[in-house]
């Protein structure tokens, strides 16, 4: 069908008109995939929001970023994926009109960029906690976390709202069943919009995230070496606390790194296709090539609840209390869950009273233990004691000793003592006669 792209309610870019229509099976498969991602994304992130808002132990400043991320992913799944795109895929064309296309693209841009920027704030928070644990716990608060979240939304909206006012545009892409920012048109407005979004809304967060997590990994490695050196000097209780703190610290770093990696893999294809369309061979941007980033982006909303349900002990504990059937369905390793709970039980839950994150409490515990060991070493008396040996000891030899010319020249004489003559004596060695008067 040469006019498969025709839509009386939409302006279709001429780039997409040169390609043949994709098979019907592709539309239906894409619609089913988007529906599954939308349902799982809404359900999973809805559970995360419910548990984090209901469970008091999870209501920490650091976890406010997780709630914000879950809210962003929930709304992204609800509006930008299912059901609008699913319906269009089954009907094989966009059916909601030009105005809805702009709103759809705007919502996708805002919530997509919000997810990336929230990941950036999570990495900054983890960096401050692990690299500067004593100061991070004092500075981070619910108010500061709220201000950072407001900044995330303002920053994301600034870059997403440009096409609404003529800086770029929102239009149909790929198989023409969803709308996104225009990365096909090669004019000054579109190109400047793409370049600025790539630098400030994509590369800038990536650089910050990589910087933070590189330093986190280096810090974790250094802490492990320090804990290994301390292990020989700690008693059993302190050693267990140290091991629990190091284990929890490593797990928290791994959780955050996995989440960030998943998000970057979800949004990097969009950046690659946009740059290819603007500066590379545009004929490579086929409907299939343009639709693959859409699938990665829509699936990003389901990663975070899955990662946290598997890796976050306190979150799993909240699931077990409210939704035990999820643990049964997913077949969690109960022994691993208990081990994680035991490990975290060794760390005082300071955030319940002071508002600081679990990370800060763990790091403060480790720092306090290290300071205690240093204080104990300083209290032990130095050996040898200061001032020993006394000054002037041992005394110097008397003046003129030994006398000059001592020993005399030629002493001992050559051949002294004389070597024994003849073969060694035969038989047993002679026995000395007993002293007189002894029987």
Swiss-Prot record:
<keyword id="KW-0325">Glycoprotein</keyword>
<keyword id="KW-0472">Membrane</keyword>
<dbReference type="GO" id="GO:0042995">
    <property type="term" value="C:cell projection"/>
</dbReference>
<feature type="transmembrane region" description="Helical; Name=6">
    <location>
        <begin position="255"/>
        <end position="276"/>
    </location>
</feature>
<protein>
    <recommendedName>
        <fullName>Rhodopsin</fullName>
    </recommendedName>
</protein>
<keyword id="KW-0716">Sensory transduction</keyword>
<feature type="glycosylation site" description="N-linked (GlcNAc...) asparagine">
    <location>
        <position position="1"/>
    </location>
</feature>
<feature type="compositionally biased region" description="Pro residues">
    <location>
        <begin position="382"/>
        <end position="433"/>
    </location>
</feature>
<feature type="topological domain" description="Cytoplasmic">
    <location>
        <begin position="309"/>
        <end position="439"/>
    </location>
</feature>
<feature type="transmembrane region" description="Helical; Name=5">
    <location>
        <begin position="193"/>
        <end position="217"/>
    </location>
</feature>
<feature type="topological domain" description="Cytoplasmic">
    <location>
        <begin position="125"/>
        <end position="144"/>
    </location>
</feature>
<dbReference type="GO" id="GO:0005886">
    <property type="term" value="C:plasma membrane"/>
</dbReference>
<feature type="topological domain" description="Cytoplasmic">
    <location>
        <begin position="218"/>
        <end position="254"/>
    </location>
</feature>
<comment type="similarity">
    <text>Belongs to the G-protein coupled receptor 1 family. Opsin subfamily.</text>
</comment>
<dbReference type="InterPro" id="IPR000276">
    <property type="entry name" value="GPCR_Rhodpsn"/>
</dbReference>
<keyword id="KW-0812">Transmembrane</keyword>
<keyword id="KW-1133">Transmembrane helix</keyword>
<dbReference type="Pfam" id="PF00001">
    <property type="entry name" value="7tm_1"/>
</dbReference>
<keyword id="KW-0564">Palmitate</keyword>
<feature type="transmembrane region" description="Helical; Name=4">
    <location>
        <begin position="145"/>
        <end position="165"/>
    </location>
</feature>
<dbReference type="InterPro" id="IPR006031">
    <property type="entry name" value="XYPPX"/>
</dbReference>
<feature type="topological domain" description="Extracellular">
    <location>
        <begin position="1"/>
        <end position="26"/>
    </location>
</feature>
<feature type="topological domain" description="Extracellular">
    <location>
        <begin position="277"/>
        <end position="286"/>
    </location>
</feature>
<dbReference type="Pfam" id="PF02162">
    <property type="entry name" value="XYPPX"/>
</dbReference>
<feature type="compositionally biased region" description="Low complexity">
    <location>
        <begin position="369"/>
        <end position="381"/>
    </location>
</feature>
<keyword id="KW-0807">Transducer</keyword>
<feature type="region of interest" description="Disordered">
    <location>
        <begin position="369"/>
        <end position="439"/>
    </location>
</feature>
<dbReference type="GO" id="GO:0004930">
    <property type="term" value="F:G protein-coupled receptor activity"/>
</dbReference>
<feature type="transmembrane region" description="Helical; Name=7">
    <location>
        <begin position="287"/>
        <end position="308"/>
    </location>
</feature>
<comment type="function">
    <text>Photoreceptor required for image-forming vision at low light intensity. Light-induced isomerization of 11-cis to all-trans retinal triggers a conformational change that activates signaling via G-proteins. Signaling mediates the activation of phospholipase C. Subsequent receptor phosphorylation mediates displacement of the bound G-protein alpha subunit by arrestin and terminates signaling.</text>
</comment>
<dbReference type="GO" id="GO:0007601">
    <property type="term" value="P:visual perception"/>
</dbReference>
<dbReference type="InterPro" id="IPR017452">
    <property type="entry name" value="GPCR_Rhodpsn_7TM"/>
</dbReference>
<feature type="transmembrane region" description="Helical; Name=3">
    <location>
        <begin position="103"/>
        <end position="124"/>
    </location>
</feature>
<keyword id="KW-0600">Photoreceptor protein</keyword>
<dbReference type="GO" id="GO:0007602">
    <property type="term" value="P:phototransduction"/>
</dbReference>
<dbReference type="InterPro" id="IPR050125">
    <property type="entry name" value="GPCR_opsins"/>
</dbReference>
<dbReference type="GO" id="GO:0009881">
    <property type="term" value="F:photoreceptor activity"/>
</dbReference>
<feature type="topological domain" description="Extracellular">
    <location>
        <begin position="166"/>
        <end position="192"/>
    </location>
</feature>
<feature type="lipid moiety-binding region" description="S-palmitoyl cysteine">
    <location>
        <position position="330"/>
    </location>
</feature>
<feature type="modified residue" description="N6-(retinylidene)lysine">
    <location>
        <position position="298"/>
    </location>
</feature>
<dbReference type="GO" id="GO:0016918">
    <property type="term" value="F:retinal binding"/>
</dbReference>
<keyword id="KW-0844">Vision</keyword>
